[in-house]
Amino acid sequence: MALSRIYSSKLASANKNLLPVITTYVRNASDSTDLKAVLSEKIPKEQERVKNFRKQFGATKVGEVTVDMMYGGMRGIKGLVCETSVLDPDEGIRFRGLSIPECQKVLPKAPGGAEPLPEGLFWLLITGDVPTKAQVDALSREWANRAALPSHVVTMLNNMPTTLHPMSQLSCAVTALNHESKYAKAYSEGVHKSKYWEYVYEDSMDLIAKLPVVAATIYRNTYRDGKGIGAIDPKKDWSANFTKMLGYEDEQFTELMRLYLTIHSDHEGGNVSAHTVHLVGSALSDPYLSFAAGMNGLAGPLHGLANQEVLVWLQKLRKELGDNASEDKVKDFIWKTLKSGQVVPGYGHAVLRKTDPRYTCQREFALKHLPNDPLFQLVSNIYKVVPPILTELGKVKNPWPNVDAHSGVLLQYYGLKEMNYYTVLFGVSRALGVLASLVWDRALGLPIERPKSMSTDGLMKAVGASK
């Protein structure tokens, strides 16, 4: 029986002429385990829906732009379309309308497992449907069958200096995979633009399948003296194969990776990595080049390095106060950090105004599997004392923890202690969201991105300011 689901979604507009409404949707998921065939049925309907929507409301304003927005990283400007996820300031991320707790409940799991399989989330992101277990199993097998790396990429990875940052190695390897791009080949042969999405889909599926192999090879070469990663097991899921290739056999760690790869997969379209993939893809660059560009953005300290900064700060606190520090001593350390002009890493978010649900689900995992771990207990104490202090300070819009306040602690517990590698894990996960979006970018025929820029003099003239 095809899976049916009814849910409500609040649709609001900044324009006063468009009143908020509650709409009820019924989603009938196909029984087919052929993901491309499922998409082939959905895409024409969505193309028609968007066409009609633009025809009727194309000239309708959805927001305003201030001078501060232009100088402030375009924060808050509504300028992108992203179908896969929406970030609610109060509820956190919703993947195709589903919150993280809802995804944990309805997405298929591994036998005996409690966390959702990332394959299921990818199916949800790219189709909008909650998949069946059979569909997820088929996707696991398909990715296993597509996972082999071409020999030139293996040679390249094995000849990179082990001192080269893992993210640089990832970017190089993904760029080199462009040699195998089915989309680039089809484009050069003059394929019709209505077929672009099919080849972007093929490249995206190949890339997602190969990323754990690339990432595991980087890990083994850089931190394990080049020990082989072994072969992909077609009977295992994507995360299980990844952890096995990394060299970890602990089933709890595999469960953690399933959770980690799910919750880091997507976060709307405006963050640096997602926007970069969309931007580069809008020039009709293939998925390999687009994703590599996104990974170069993710490698930046302000985007993908936050959980490392949290760990460094925690280790500093632990070294100074010890494992059993009292709440009062932790409070004193927090105040000392703030008074020195630094921030408390892992707290606050550009959009969220409550505790990040990605933090919450990791905390629940820790409470279940490692409640007595000293580093986790320290994180728990910090969770108690930091929000009231930041609230008292009065300068912070969001005093609550984000995803980065917790992820590094869990990885450390299970023995993956190489902090420079953490962003690679983030990148493997983020592929699920950004590549699902890239397929839809081409399916909807979105044009090359080309916003208008202005000089300071031009802005001053536009607003009537004196120079």
Swiss-Prot record:
UniProt-annotated location(s): Mitochondrion matrix
Catalytic activity field: oxaloacetate + acetyl-CoA + H2O = citrate + CoA + H(+)
PANTHER family, A to Z: CITRATE SYNTHASE (PTHR11739), CITRATE SYNTHASE, MITOCHONDRIAL (PTHR11739:SF8)
Keywords: Mitochondrion, Transferase, Transit peptide, Tricarboxylic acid cycle
Class of enzymatic activity (EC top level): transferase
Keyword Glycosyltransferase included in the entry's annotation: no
Pathway this chain belongs to: Carbohydrate metabolism; tricarboxylic acid cycle; isocitrate from oxaloacetate: step 1/2
EC number: 2.3.3.16
GO biological process: carbohydrate metabolic process; citrate metabolic process; tricarboxylic acid cycle
Top-level taxonomy: Eukaryota, Metazoa, Ecdysozoa, Arthropoda, Hexapoda
Name under which the protein is recorded: Probable citrate synthase 1, mitochondrial
